[in-house]
UniProtKB/Swiss-Prot annotation:
One of its GO terms (cellular component) is cytosol. SMART domains: AAA (SM00382). GO terms for biological process: DNA recombination; DNA repair; SOS response. One of its GO terms (molecular function) is ATP binding. It comes from Vibrio anguillarum (strain ATCC 68554 / 775) (Listonella anguillarum). InterPro entries: AAA+_ATPase, DNA_recomb/repair_RecA, DNA_recomb/repair_RecA_CS, P-loop_NTPase, RecA-like_C, RecA-like_N, RecA_ATP-bd, RecA_C_sf. The gene is recA. This is Protein RecA. It is found in: Cytoplasm.
């Protein structure tokens, strides 16, 4: 670029920053735009599948799946992980179904968690937008999109038709929220439910509620499914769970994580450490015995998990080694939301 063009560009950049604030325009190679801050999901397998070590700050995330698949558990685990590193979290409980006792068991500090139980969908989204604009909140969870009922539907009669009302409400909210979340570096997680499309002969008949806007605006979309039961004798103590990364704007998508959710405990972290440790040769397995750093840690997986549970320093060291081995920052893709590509109201 010649000198006159450089001067003109510098003057234009200076004018833009003066008018709209510092950081309103920058070069893509600037380090500030390349760093993606993430928060652990509480599951090592999922953090690795996401490629960045967790879910990204300043972005919209969608978690969806069938009933009782672990959607709320996943978000509560993330809230607990965020609180452990000093983040402030809010939970907008549109379903009016949050169990504080269960949240506490998962490690959530319920005394510090902000909770709202809004009456209408518009109220829920306004509260979310106000929290994001405050700059004081780091993580907002909305449970769930299906329960965000428009005011007109609540005030109307049973049987009234409100075609596309919720989709229009969400589309408008996404346009407002995206910029505010980015500026305040606040993550917003939408929990969503599954519905069936009628008359689909080929392809997947499943879809999520609330129209297409959320699909476009979300930087990460997670599909969580229960694949089996975990039994101790005849008693079912948890679920085998598979989480697919359906969309990912910060690393390679379409990876999946197989994990276990234990009732009343959340993710089976020690089980993940043992399985991944054996797979990547950090934990040795000879017959039924497991060894770590040359020392036997248990006969059978249950005893190996018990050892790691009772020795958090060893568990943390193994977790750190696995993250260093399996998370490659060079693979990260930083893709900012492009407003011109977002769906407008007629595309709902």
């Amino acid at each position: 670029m010649d000198e006159n063009k450089q001067k003109a560009l510098a003057a234009a950049l200076g004018q833009i920053e003066k008018q709209f604030g510092k950081g309103s325009i920058m070069r893509l190679g600037d380090n500030r735009t390349m760093d993606v801050e993430t928060i652990s999901t509480g599951s090592l397998s999922l953090d690795i599948a996401l490629g960045a070590g967790g879910l990204p700050m300043g972005r919209i995330v969608e978690v969806y799946g069938p009933e009782s698949s672990g959607k709320t558990t996943l978000t509560l685990e993330l809230i607990a992980a965020a609180q452990r590193v000093g983040k402030t979290c809010a939970f907008i409980d549109a379903e009016h179904a949050l169990d504080p006792i269960y949240a506490k068991k998962l490690g959530v500090n319920i005394d510090e968690l902000l909770v709202s139980q809004p009456d209408t969908g518009e109220q829920a989204l306004e509260i979310c937008d106000a929290l994001a604009r405050s700059g004081a909140i780091d993580v907002i969870v909305i449970d769930s999109v299906a329960a965000l009922t428009p005011k007109a539907e609540i005030e109307g009669e049973m049987g009234d038709s409100h075609m596309g009302l919720q989709a229009r409400m969400l589309s408008q909210a996404m346009r407002k929220l995206t910029g505010n979340l980015k500026q305040s570096n606040c993550m917003c997680i939408f929990i969503n439910q599954i519905r069936m499309k009628i008359g689909v002969m080929f392809g997947n008949p499943e879809t999520t509620t609330g129209g297409n806007a959320l699909k476009f605006y979300a930087s990460v979309r997670l599909d969580i499914r229960r694949t089996g039961s975990i039994k101790e004798g005849d008693e079912v103590v948890g679920n085998e769970t598979r989480i697919k990364v359906v969309k990912n704007k910060i690393a390679a998508p379409f990876k999946q994580a197989d994990t276990q959710i234990l009732y009343g405990q959340g993710f089976n972290r020690e089980g993940e450490l043992v399985d991944l440790g054996v797979k990547h040769k950090l934990v040795e397995k000879a017959g039924a015995w497991y060894s770590y750093n040359g020392d036997k840690i248990g006969q059978g997986k249950a005893n190996a998990c018990k050892f790691l549970r009772e020795n958090p320093a060893a568990a943390m060291a193994l977790d750190t080694k696995l993250r260093e081995m399996l998370l490659n920052p060079a693979e990260l893709i930083v893709e900012e939301p492009i407003l011109s590509e977002m769906p407008q109201e007629e595309e709902l």
